[in-house]
């Protein structure tokens, strides 16, 4: 049986796409995934171009594949994702041993691209944008555990000044309303209890409702997903403050299946910097969303993306960012130094801030966020948390592990509980009393419901 190895860079959208690459090759060519690159008949790199460092990692990885390709001439090497969209045929020019190059919207054509490469001996490149076509050609999802990603829309139409996503993934296109619900229902029938709805700007979803001219917004989609039997938790990422409607906020007051955790990227806390980024909202507007959400859910956990060192960022601008991090109390977040991307407006902005200053700012920001993370984890000690059990604990298979609503891994023992009963708990919701907080996980005790 042939095997496929996939290395994924970047966001959860890429993780979802990588799973679909495996699914489509399994359905059409009977390939099975492998974690050992040397065992693979097909090696795929699903790439990210959001920062220069991530992009260069891909070419470094490709360089290491040259010897493997020489030893196995029939090996197929493919590059997908956003670097593929951005670089296209130049990838083959730089690494002639690459066989196929495909974009996020053409991954469903992967079997045909591989076949054409094998028949013609020529590298194949397809980085077109056939909108939402790929979802019509993908096989049903293969379930691996009680949680699953569901892509509901593709692309981005916001054109932030620093971002390549609109150029590499195309404009915003939403999947039809009924198609999304059918996929979620199919996952629920296979034992999935938690879905994460995915999109570059997931709350910009506007899906056509079959047989009518009506359009479903994101809040309506969530309401319908919540009504699907078996679904107990709903997450989504990545949301955009500009698309955060009152309807969506109000949903947190009446939909218990929406978790108490939200990733809402602010990027910065200076209105001047936000304007330069072309984010389309003010700091006050962003804070208003948080205030209204926490009025409904006082324990709402917030995470974000942050960019430091954007051209023209002053010490005063950075101080505003740090003040907001303290004020909001952000949980685990993503933070980076500004990386100019070719073809974006921000790449042409004058930047006179020394790299050492940017690095110092980033380190301070990350240290403060980590303090918040540890404080939040410590505050959970002594509380009973509802856990979705994912499987045996990694370090001790006699224990189980799962996740809290705010996305923390909890390992817990079940003294006196027979193995067969433990196995049945996987995929179920259980109560766990948190007893210890560690840097990257929690520990607890199983609570028997009376």
UniProtKB/Swiss-Prot annotation:
Keywords: 4Fe-4S, Cytoplasm, Iron, Iron-sulfur, Metal-binding, S-adenosyl-L-methionine, Transferase, tRNA processing. Residues 378-448 form the TRAM domain. The keyword Cell cycle does not apply. InterPro entries: Elp3/MiaA/NifB-like_rSAM, Methylthiotransferase, Methylthiotransferase_CS, Methylthiotransferase_N, Methylthiotransferase_N_sf, MiaB_methiolase, rSAM, rSAM_horseshoe. It holds the Pfam family UPF0004. Belongs to the methylthiotransferase family. MiaB subfamily. This is tRNA-2-methylthio-N(6)-dimethylallyladenosine synthase. It comes from Cupriavidus metallidurans (strain ATCC 43123 / DSM 2839 / NBRC 102507 / CH34). The lineage of its organism: Bacteria, Pseudomonadati, Pseudomonadota, Betaproteobacteria, Burkholderiales.
């Amino acid at each position: 049986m042939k095997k496929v190895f996939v290395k994924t860079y970047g966001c959860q959208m890429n993780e979802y796409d990588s799973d679909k690459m495996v699914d489509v090759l399994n359905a059409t060519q009977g390939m099975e995934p492998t974690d050992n690159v040397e065992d693979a008949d097909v090696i795929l790199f699903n790439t990210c171009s959001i920062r220069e460092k991530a992009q260069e990692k891909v070419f470094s990885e490709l360089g290491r594949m040259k010897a493997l390709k020489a030893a196995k001439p029939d090996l197929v090497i493919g590059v997908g994702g956003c670097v593929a969209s951005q670089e296209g045929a130049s990838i083959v020019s730089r690494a002639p041993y690459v066989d196929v190059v495909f974009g996020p919207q053409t991954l469903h054509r992967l079997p045909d691209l591989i076949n054409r490469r094998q028949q013609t001996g020529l590298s194949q490149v397809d980085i077109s944008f056939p909108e939402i076509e790929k979802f019509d050609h993908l096989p049903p999802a293969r379930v691996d555990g009680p949680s699953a990603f569901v892509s509901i829309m593709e692309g981005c139409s916001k054109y932030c000044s620093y971002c390549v996503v609109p150029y590499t993934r195309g404009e915003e296109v939403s999947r039809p309303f009924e198609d999304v619900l059918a996929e979620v229902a199919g996952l629920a029938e296979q034992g999935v209890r938690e879905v994460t709805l995915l999109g570059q700007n997931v709350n910009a979803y506007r899906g056509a409702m079959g047989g009518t001219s009506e359009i479903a917004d994101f809040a309506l989609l969530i309401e319908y997903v919540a009504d699907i039997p078996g679904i107990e938790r709903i997450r989504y990422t990545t949301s955009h403050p500009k698309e955060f409607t009152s309807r969506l906020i109000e949903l947190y007051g009446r939909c218990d299946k929406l978790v108490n955790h939200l990733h809402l990227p602010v990027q910065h806390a200076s209105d001047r910097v936000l304007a330069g980024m072309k984010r389309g909202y003010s700091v006050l507007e962003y804070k208003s969303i948080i205030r209204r959400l926490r009025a409904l859910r006082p324990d709402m956990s917030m995470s974000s993306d942050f960019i430091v060192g954007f051209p023209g960022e002053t010490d005063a601008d950075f101080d505003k960012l740090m003040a907001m991090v303290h004020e909001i109390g952000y949980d685990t977040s993503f933070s980076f130094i500004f990386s100019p991307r070719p073809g974006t407006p921000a790449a042409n902005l004058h930047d006179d801030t020394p790299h050492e200053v940017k690095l110092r700012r980033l380190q301070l920001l990350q240290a403060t966020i980590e303090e918040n993370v540890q404080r939040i984890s410590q505050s959970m000690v002594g509380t009973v948390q509802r856990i979705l059990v994912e499987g045996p604990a990694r370090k001790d298979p006699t224990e189980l592990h799962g996740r809290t609503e705010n996305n923390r891994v909890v390992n817990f023992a079940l003294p006196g509980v027979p193995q067969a009963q433990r196995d049945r708990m996987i995929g179920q919701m259980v109560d766990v009393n948190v007893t210890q907080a560690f840097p990257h996980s929690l520990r607890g005790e199983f609570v028997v419901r009376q």
